[in-house]
């Protein structure tokens, strides 16, 4: 049984599933922005869908706040996603993920395709977001062990869908599992 926020998701109605979505924020691997909508409109989208109680002015104010929180300069808000850099698209995706003040944030390979400087920037945004939003659970899916250890206070390592080890990062450094040790040697100790 998989429970989210105390509810068994296998028995949820369609209506309950839709209501549950407002508790989640997802930063997708490739940002998954609407190409035909401005950066600002991409962030406003989940608010329009799930917060019918908000006025247009309130939605706009929240979107501006989340974009600012994500570190995106206001001069880019009226641009289309294709007109901004990969790092800016990630920031826009993060702002959209944060728009509903979710209880659970999921980051799917958030630094894929980014250079080391942008990778560190995105990692820092994730850390800042997690540290400033008390009561929010964050799940970061990554092949970058160094980042996982830097960001996560609890890490799980999977191989072919099976959990090899889970716990605090320090546990991985002390593991005698040969596969875990190999990953750690390649991904963390070399850094």
Predicted regions, residues:
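Conserved ABC ATPase "signature" region
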Residues: 8, 56-75
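Conserved ABC ATPase signature
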Residues: 80-84, 88
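Conserved catalytic motifs of ABC-family nucleotide-binding domains
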Residues: 101
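Catalytic Walker B motif of ABC-type/P-loop ATPase nucleotide-binding domains
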Residues: 105-108
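Helical segment within the ABC ATPase nucleotide-binding domain
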Residues: 120-134
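ABC ATPase "signature
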Residues: 166-167
């Amino acid at each position: 049984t998989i429970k989210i926020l105390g509810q068994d998701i296998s028995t949820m109605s369609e209506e309950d599933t839709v209501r549950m979505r407002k508790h989640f924020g997802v930063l997708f691997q490739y940002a998954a922005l609407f190409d035909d909508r401005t950066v600002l409109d991409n962030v406003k989208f989940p608010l329009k869908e799930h917060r019918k109680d908000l006025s247009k002015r309130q939605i706009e104010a929240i979107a501006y706040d989340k974009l600012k929180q994500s570190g995106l300069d206001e001069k880019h808000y009226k641009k289309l996603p294709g007109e901004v850099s990969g790092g800016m698209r990630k920031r826009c995706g993060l702002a959209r993920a944060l728009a509903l003040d979710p209880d659970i944030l999921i980051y799917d390979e958030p630094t894929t395709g980014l250079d080391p400087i942008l990778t560190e920037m995105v990692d820092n945004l994730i850390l800042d977001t997690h540290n400033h939003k008390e009561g929010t659970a964050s799940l970061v899916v990554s092949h970058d062990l160094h980042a996982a250890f830097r960001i996560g206070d609890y890490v799980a390592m999977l191989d072919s869908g099976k959990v090899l080890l889970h716990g605090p990062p320090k546990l991985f450094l002390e593991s005698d599992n040969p596969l875990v040790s190999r990953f750690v040697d390649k991904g963390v100790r070399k850094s």
